[in-house]
């Protein structure tokens, strides 16, 4: 742990931005998951399991870190209805440290660590199933090239929880999440709602200093910051589409200003292409359906722009906000082609390919992940596609425009197509029935082998796709 570099930057914002809280005492602390790859990025990979549990189960502070955890304050639009009673209701910012690989700031924050002033009558806990689901989401998305938070640790707490949306009583857990930031659009919204322009300016300066240092000398910092966040969030939205991912609850309090996916709830991956596919049973209107995710992100970014008006002007911010759709339209072909391991040809050709691809995917209902697995490398994947379970789809007339386009694209460098992963018949997927199949033996007989196997297969996929931590 000699290289571990803790910092206390968020604490410098002051008490107007957080509440100092205490972690809940748990009857048991059973280590269920520790991410050694990311622990190494922090310099804590050599902690013993006992030391790990002390910090990430009992939340004993690291030397040089926060003396007490910080429950962060924020508001947010939930399904487009404003809620001023939000905040960290079952988690807190526990520590910050410098990423030893790239020098960037990393937050360690919790989920399920107990009640806070923002719990709103809830128990402040996380179910073990919820923790397992978050591990699977973050690992899978990282392997698919999506900018995501990471699940650093999961500790089972020995508690029995009552929940209305899953069989109860159910086992409890506490998760530690890594993300470069836990500043949300809702963090800015709270300050705008309270009419605190000085604090908005302070938060903006903090965000620029630690997450967008290239903007320190910008002539109009609010506009430059907005455009940078738009770029990150639009890219994240395009990556979701390319991964076939549905977040489920795209409220403004769930959108990170660094464009990292986090706050996973009822997430799902698409079985087949369906723009109307929803992840949350309570999303009755499809507001956050697969195909409407870019629209939801654009709406949320508009709310961020509104918060910055007191520091700038509508006229100055509008050009940055107007880049949302152009940035997404540019990011989507790039994300899809990156998944296929192909070099872009140019905006018109790439847009035509995207249109042909989704027309085919909708008409054929080819399994979403299977297509990207089969055609990794474009024409270089023809032999793999020919032996695929989806091969019949590729013989159809609707596939012809896609086949022609794939022939036109050149492969990217270092595709690694001889990796053993590409000898499989089917790719590793994480559909809802697979998630349930991983969870069932844990719930029934404390059998974690299914989770360990899934994580090993995801690691193989990540290696095959050349995704670095």
Q: Which stretches of residues belong to each language-model region?
A:
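Regulatory N- and C-terminal appendages and interdomain linkers associated
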Residues: 1-73, 279, 284-469
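Active-site-adjacent bridging/hinge elements
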Residues: 8-14, 106-117, 204-208, 272-282, ...
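Short, contiguous strand/loop micro-motifs
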Residues: 22-24, 123-125, 223-224
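Conserved ATP-binding subdomain of kinase catalytic cores across diverse folds
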Residues: 28-31, 37-47, 58-219, 258-260, ...
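Residue-level "edge-of-site" marker
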Residues: 52, 154-155, 253
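ATP-dependent phospho-/nucleotidyl transfer catalytic cores
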Residues: 131, 161-247, 258-347, 351
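Hydrophobic HxD+1 residue recognition
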Residues: 249-250, 255
């Amino acid at each position: 742990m000699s290289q571990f570099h803790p910092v206390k930057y968020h604490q410098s914002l002051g008490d107007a931005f957080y509440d100092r809280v205490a972690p809940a005492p748990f009857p048991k602390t059973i280590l269920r998951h520790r991410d050694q790859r990311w622990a190494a990025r922090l310099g804590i990979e050599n902690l013993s399991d006992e030391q790990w549990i002390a910090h990430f189960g009992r939340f004993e502070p690291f030397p040089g870190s926060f003396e007490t955890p910080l429950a962060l304050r924020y508001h947010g639009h939930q399904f487009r209805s404003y809620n001023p009673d939000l905040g960290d209701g079952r988690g807190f910012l526990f520590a910050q440290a410098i990423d030893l690989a790239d020098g960037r700031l990393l937050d360690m924050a919790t989920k399920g660590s107990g009640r806070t002033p923002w719990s709103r009558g809830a128990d402040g806990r996380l179910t073990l199933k919820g923790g397992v689901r978050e591990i699977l989401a973050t690992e899978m998305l990282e392997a698919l090239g999506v900018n995501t938070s990471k699940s650093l640790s999961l500790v089972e707490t020995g508690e029995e929880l009552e929940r209305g949306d899953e069989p109860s009583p159910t086992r409890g857990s506490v998760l530690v999440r890594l993300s470069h930031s836990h500043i949300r659009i809702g963090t800015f919204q709270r300050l705008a709602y309270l009419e605190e322009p000085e604090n908005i300016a302070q938060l903006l300066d903090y965000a620029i200093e630690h997450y967008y240092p290239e903007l320190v000398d910008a002539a109009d910092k609010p506009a430059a910051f907005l455009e940078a966040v738009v770029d990150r969030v639009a890219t994240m939205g395009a990556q979701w589409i390319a991964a076939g991912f549905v977040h489920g609850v795209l409220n403004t309090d769930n959108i990170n200003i660094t464009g990292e996916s986090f706050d996973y709830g009822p997430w799902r991956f698409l079985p087949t292409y369906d723009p109307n596919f929803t992840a949350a049973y309570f999303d009755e209107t499809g507001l956050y359906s697969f195909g409407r995710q870019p629209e939801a992100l654009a709406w949320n970014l508009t709310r961020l722009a509104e918060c910055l008006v007191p520091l700038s002007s509508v006229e100055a911010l509008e050009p940055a906000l107007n880049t949302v759709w152009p940035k997404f339209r540019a990011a989507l072909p790039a994300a899809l082609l990156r998944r296929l391991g192909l070099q872009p040809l140019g905006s018109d050709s790439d847009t035509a390919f995207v249109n042909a691809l989704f027309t085919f995917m909708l008409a054929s209902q080819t399994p979403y992940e299977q297509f990207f697995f089969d055609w990794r490398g474009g024409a270089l994947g023809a032999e793999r596609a020919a032996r695929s379970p989806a091969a019949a789809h590729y013989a159809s007339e609707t596939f012809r425009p896609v086949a022609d386009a794939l022939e036109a694209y050149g492969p990217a460098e270092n595709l690694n197509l001889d990796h053993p992963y590409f000898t499989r018949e089917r790719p590793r997927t994480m559909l809802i029935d697979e998630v349930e199949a991983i969870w069932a033996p844990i719930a029934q007989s404390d059998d974690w082998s299914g989770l360990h196997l899934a994580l090993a297969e995801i690691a193989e996929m990540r290696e095959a796709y050349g995704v670095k931590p």
